[in-house]
């Protein structure tokens, strides 16, 4: 029998107030036919690949940490186009428009040969190789070994006009009811979002985790990350950013495979269920009391990965990238006349080994006690960018969205809302710091605060390195050819007529 029943589900009505719609920059930004080329100098850095080398008293850093497994976060600044000496001042009307830069091309140049650099720890927490065993591992108080390995191979860069957002797992706050019952227990974890700064470590095969807070043994990972937080770009959050400023586009290439299989030392935190509650031998059968297997070994297994082959056939660098359509609403507009380029690349990860004598004298025979070995890592970068000059109309609906997105942009354009002064005449004392006059005002005018001043970046100033002569630079010539802007050479017709030979008649 078919019966009619009323709908039991809830009825959802649209919200009464209108929902604000974020416009794409293509809807209100007018692009011009003026292009500039910007190129940095060679950017070089040298340091120790595993840690900072400090002075004897520890007060200063003598050799900084420079690892191939670090992020390089470049903050590139450009001149203000509204104060720029344009060759053609009829490009825009300063009374009704403002100028901004748009990134249309980028090439991240990398010097130095390809190479694999290893990392490790002289006291690495590994009991034994668990892939090929000949005898059962017994109990011991310290089984740490001197171990090294090559990291996961990573090539990656993220381009935007605000810093790249990273994510990592960290210790979470314990609930109030469990705060006094945490001895010997695994702490709760939470996913945290932080800005990726220059010098932060990326994942090399042990995960994006805060090793400093979650590894009390200081021997679970290699030396270069044991006191660091490994971060990974939060592509999901940046892709869903309403304005799309953090990531115009990105390129990523990661590869690894499990090379060695080890097990940790120490007691197992989460015991096997059979040993804990005797669940009818669902996981294993106990050994006889006379066997070594009677004392169950550790089951905290982990691999050390390898990045495998490094080849020039799979390089993301030293090649141009053209931006036609960004993944978000911001199609390459550089708000604040700056661009953030976050790079991760360990395919040029060679660590130099430098040896000297302990006393500084020449040696005639080898003696390891009289030799000191040093490690150094070097990196070389060069940034080339193609900029397009764009115009923004000073309309109410456009300024409203820009003000909601970032009010500092309007202040830079000198379009801030100026309140009506309370009194046109102000008091100005000449000797304000003397004892004869009143104390100075407690609130002093503050300089404009840099929203990213608390972060560490590799600052690259290109305010005086822009050029209209695109054909004088490698990336500029590639852009001219790619955009079809090259001038075709005229065909020169020869005025000399070639006389035809006399054709013989057949007889």
From Swiss-Prot:
Record-linked SUPFAM superfamilies: Group I dsDNA viruses
InterPro entries documented for this protein: Capsid_L1_Papillomavir, Capsid_L1_sf_Papillomavir, dsDNA_vir_gr_I_capsid
Molecular function terms, GO-annotated: structural molecule activity
Record has Disulfide bond as a keyword: yes
Membrane-crossing residue ranges in chain numbering: none
Location relative to the cell: Virion; Host nucleus
Cellular component terms (Gene Ontology): host cell nucleus; T=7 icosahedral viral capsid
Highest taxon above the source species: Viruses
GO BP annotation list: endocytosis involved in viral entry into host cell; virion attachment to host cell
UniProt keywords, alphabetically: Capsid protein, Disulfide bond, Host nucleus, Host-virus interaction, Late protein, T=7 icosahedral capsid protein, Viral attachment to host cell, Viral penetration into host cytoplasm, Virion, Virus endocytosis by host, Virus entry into host cell
Disordered: annotated span: 122-147
Feature: compositional bias, Polar residues: 132-147
The protein's assembly and partners: Self-assembles into homopentamers. The capsid has an icosahedral symmetry and consists of 72 capsomers, with each capsomer being a pentamer of L1. Interacts with the minor capsid protein L2; this interaction is necessary for viral genome encapsidation. Interacts with protein E2; this interaction enhances E2-dependent replication and transcription activation.
Known function: Forms an icosahedral capsid with a T=7 symmetry and a 50 nm diameter. The capsid is composed of 72 pentamers linked to each other by disulfide bonds and associated with L2 proteins. Binds to heparan sulfate proteoglycans on cell surface of basal layer keratinocytes to provide initial virion attachment. This binding mediates a conformational change in the virus capsid that facilitates efficient infection. The virion enters the host cell via endocytosis. During virus trafficking, L1 protein dissociates from the viral DNA and the genomic DNA is released to the host nucleus.
Family recorded in the similarity comment: Belongs to the papillomaviridae L1 protein family.
Descriptive protein name: Major capsid protein L1
Organism: Human papillomavirus 15
Species classification: Viruses, Monodnaviria, Shotokuvirae, Cossaviricota, Papovaviricetes
Gene: L1
């Amino acid at each position: 029998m078919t019966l009619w029943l009323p709908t039991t589900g809830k009825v959802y009505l649209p919200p009464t107030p209108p929902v604000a719609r974020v416009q794409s920059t293509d809807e209100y930004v007018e692009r011009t036919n003026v292009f500039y080329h910007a190129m940095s100098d060679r950017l070089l850095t040298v340091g120790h690949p595993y840690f900072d080398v400090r002075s004897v008293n520890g007060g200063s850093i003598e050799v900084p940490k420079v690892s191939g497994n670090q992020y390089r976060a470049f903050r590139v600044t450009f001149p203000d186009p509204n104060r720029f000496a344009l060759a053609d001042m009829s490009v825009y009307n300063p009374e009704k428009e403002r100028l901004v830069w748009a990134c249309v091309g980028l090439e991240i140049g990398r010097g130095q040969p390809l190479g694999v650099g290893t990392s490790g720890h002289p006291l690495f927490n590994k009991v034994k190789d668990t892939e090929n065993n000949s005898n059962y591992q017994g109990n011991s108080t310290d089984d740490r070994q001197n171990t090294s390995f090559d990291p996961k191979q990573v090539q990656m860069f993220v381009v935007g006009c605000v810093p790249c957002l990273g994510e990592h797992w960290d210790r979470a706050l314990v609930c109030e009811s469990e705060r006094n019952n945490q001895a010997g227990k695994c702490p709760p974890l939470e996913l945290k979002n932080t800005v990726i700064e220059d010098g932060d470590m990326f994942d090399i095969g042990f995960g994006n985790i805060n090793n400093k807070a979650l590894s009390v043994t200081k021997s679970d990972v290699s030396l270069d990350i044991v006191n660091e937080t490994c971060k990974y770009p939060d592509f999901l959050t940046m892709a869903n950013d309403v304005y799309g400023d953090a990531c115009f586009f990105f390129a990523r290439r990661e590869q690894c495979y499990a090379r060695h299989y080890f097990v940790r030392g120490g007691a197992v935190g989460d015991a096997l269920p059979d040993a804990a509650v005797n669940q009818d031998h669902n996981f294993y059968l106990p050994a006889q009391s006379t066997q070594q297997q009677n004392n169950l070994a550790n089951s905290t297994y982990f691999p050390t990965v390898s990045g495998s082959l490094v080849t020039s056939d799979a390089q993301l660098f030293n090649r141009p990238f053209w931006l036609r359509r960004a993944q978000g609403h911001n199609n390459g507009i550089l708000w604040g006349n700056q661009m953030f380029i976050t790079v991760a690349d360990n395919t040029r990860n060679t660590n130099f080994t430098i040896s000297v004598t302990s006393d500084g004298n020449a040696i005639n025979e080898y003696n390891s006690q009289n030799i000191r070995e040093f490690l150094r890592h070097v990196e070389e970068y060069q940034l080339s960018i193609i900029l397009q000059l764009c115009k923004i109309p000073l309309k109410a609906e456009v300024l409203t969205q820009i003000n909601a997105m970032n009010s500092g942009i309007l202040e830079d354009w000198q379009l801030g809302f100026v309140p009506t002064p309370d009194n046109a005449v102000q008091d100005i004392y000449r000797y304000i710091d003397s004892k004869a006059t009143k104390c100075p005002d407690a609130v002093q005018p503050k300089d404009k605060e840099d929203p990213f001043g608390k972060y560490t970046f590799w600052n690259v100033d290109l305010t005086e390195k822009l050029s209209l002569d695109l054909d004088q630079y490698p990336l500029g010539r590639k852009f001219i050819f790619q955009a079809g802007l090259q001038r075709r050479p005229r065909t020169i017709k020869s005025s000399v007529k070639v006389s035809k030979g006399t054709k013989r008649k057949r007889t």
